[in-house]
C-alpha cells in the first residue's frame, strides 16, 4: 500500500510537470525532409555572375532542383520542371543547382535547353562538396518544394507530381 501511494504521487507529479511545459514557437527545425525548414543556400552564382542566397526569395514558393547535365534523368526533369512552371504559370520560382564540373558544359546545356538562366546556378568549389554532402546527393539528385515560409512541402517530385500538387494548392 505504501508503494502504491508513492507511485501514485510520482505519477501525478510527472503529469503535472508535463502539462506545464511550453512548446516552442511552432516553427519546424531546419532539415532536409518534408516539414523541416529548408536550410539556406548561400552565394549561388548564375552564368552571368549574379550571386544570391536562397533566403532572398523568402515569401515565394520555391522548387529547388539539384541536377547535372551528365545525369540524364535529372537533366530531363530540370527541363520538364521549367516547362510545367512556365506553361501553367504556377506561382513558383524554380531554383536549379547544377553539379556539372565543367562550367562550359553547364552553360551550353542551358542554351540548348532554352531555360531562363536567371535562377539556374552551378555549384562551384567548396559549395560543390558541402551541398553534395549536406543534401546527401551521392544517393541521387533531389528536388524540394518549399512553401512561402521556407518549410519543405515535398521532395523528390516528378514533373507530373509537381503539376498535380500545384493544381491543388
Describe each model-derived feature in a short phrase.
Residues 1-28:
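Bacterial Sec-dependent N-terminal signal peptides
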Residues 52-75:
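Short active-site neighborhood of thiol/selenol oxidoreductases, capturing the structured segment around
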Residues 107-148:
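Short, internal strand/loop/helix patches
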Residues 63-64, 94, 143:
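Hydrophobic beta-strand anchors of alpha/beta hydrolase catalytic cores
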Residues 75-113, 127-132:
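Structural microenvironment flanking redox-active thiols in thiol-disulfide oxidoreductases
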Residues 66-67, 97-100, 123:
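Active-site-proximal beta-strand/loop segments in catalytic clefts of secreted hydrolases
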Residues 23-54:
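N-terminal "domain-start" segment that seeds a small globular fold
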Residues 140-169:
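Thiol-/selenol-based redox modules, centered on thioredoxin-like
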Amino acid at each position: 500500500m505504501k508503494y502504491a501511494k508513492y507511485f501514485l504521487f510520482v505519477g501525478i507529479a510527472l503529469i503535472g510537470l508535463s502539462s506545464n511545459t511550453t512548446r516552442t514557437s511552432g516553427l519546424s527545425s531546419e532539415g532536409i525532409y518534408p516539414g523541416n525548414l529548408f536550410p539556406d543556400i548561400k552565394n549561388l552564382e548564375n552564368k552571368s555572375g549574379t550571386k544570391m542566397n536562397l533566403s532572398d526569395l523568402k515569401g515565394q514558393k520555391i522548387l529547388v532542383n539539384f541536377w547535372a547535365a551528365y545525369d540524364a534523368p535529372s537533366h530531363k526533369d530540370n527541363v520538364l520542371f521549367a516547362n510545367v512552371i512556365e506553361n501553367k504559370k504556377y506561382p513558383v520560382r524554380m531554383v536549379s543547382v547544377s553539379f556539372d564540373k565543367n562550367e562550359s558544359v553547364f552553360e551550353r546545356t542551358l542554351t540548348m535547353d532554352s531555360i531562363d538562366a536567371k535562377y539556374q546556378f552551378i555549384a562551384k568549389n567548396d559549395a560543390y562538396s558541402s551541398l553534395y554532402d549536406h543534401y546527401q546527393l551521392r544517393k541521387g539528385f533531389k528536388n524540394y518544394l518549399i512553401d512561402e515560409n521556407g518549410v519543405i512541402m515535398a521532395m523528390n517530385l516528378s514533373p507530373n507530381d509537381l503539376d498535380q500538387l500545384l493544381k491543388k494548392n
